[in-house]
Amino acid sequence: MFIMRREFPEEGDIVIGTVKDVKPYGAFVELLEYPGKEGMIHISEVTSGWVKNIRDHVKVGQRVVAKVLRVDERKGHIDLSLKRVTEQQKRAKVQEWKRFQRASKMLERAAEKLGKSLEEAWEEVGYLLEDEFGELYNAFETMVIEGKEVLDDLEISEEWKNVLYEVAKESIELTNVEVEGVIEMKSYAPDGIKQIKKALTTALKANPYEDVEVKITYIGAPKYRVVVIAPDYKSGEEVFKKVCEKAVATIKKLGGEGTYYRESKK
């Protein structure tokens, strides 16, 4: 069970829930992030335009993403809207909820290894990790990418650090990302092809990471495609910039011309 630090959502929040009941005038939604709390979607907030039959749009058991319009904590009333949520907000909330559920199970496994309850885990480390990393799953993911050291500045016991890192490595398999771009180079020297090859070879040595791969292929004069395969976009972008800047600097030093640019993967 997840214990929210806030008993009620706030006006403007995007929440996720399950439809528990549908009446002619509206639908009642169990809020998954706030156990024991229900919100109501009035028929006028289901969709834009006139709604003849609300059951054509909302069904019992349906998972919905809604925007909080009003909250009356004294009465326990929470008014929601479906029509005021964008498609992008829906996708983001569903993804956030899936990540949260997975992270919560990981935290529970870590707690079990220490003979603690999930509630104790949240109180001792869960909320702290959320505050530091933005969301719990991001904390576990960062541990896998950067190591247990990312927890060093936090007031977390060594036993918690060890077990959190252990569970993170057991649970998360990182998927590599690709960063692509193009280098354009020209050389006016008699041995211009040799100079361009030298610039590209030198550029490859600018990659400082063992877990990042760089591929450079010929497209057609004067273009060369650069593909950086990395565990995350941050290191991928960093290596792409280092490699391309090194290639351009080298060819210019040899009397040629060079430039580079990012290219979105189709």
Swiss-Prot record:
GO biological process, one term: translational initiation
Domain S1 motif: 12-83
This protein's record includes keyword RNA-binding: yes
Short name of one Pfam family: EIF_2_alpha
PROSITE patterns given in the database record: S1
Keyword RNA-binding: yes
Gene Ontology molecular function: ribosome binding; RNA binding; translation initiation factor activity
InterPro entries: NA-bd_OB-fold, S1_domain, S1_IF2_alpha, TIF2_asu_arc, TIF2_asu_C, TIF2_asu_middle_sf, TIF_2_asu
SS bond list: none
Keyword field: Initiation factor, Protein biosynthesis, RNA-binding
NCBIfam families in the record: PRK03987.1-1, PRK03987.1-2, PRK03987.1-4
Matches recorded under HAMAP family: eIF_2_alpha (MF_00231)
Described purpose of this protein according to its UniProt entry: eIF-2 functions in the early steps of protein synthesis by forming a ternary complex with GTP and initiator tRNA.
Family stated for the protein in its record: Belongs to the eIF-2-alpha family.
Record text on subunit structure and interactions: Heterotrimer composed of an alpha, a beta and a gamma chain.
UniProt name for this protein: Translation initiation factor 2 subunit alpha
Origin species: Methanocaldococcus jannaschii (strain ATCC 43067 / DSM 2661 / JAL-1 / JCM 10045 / NBRC 100440) (Methanococcus jannaschii)
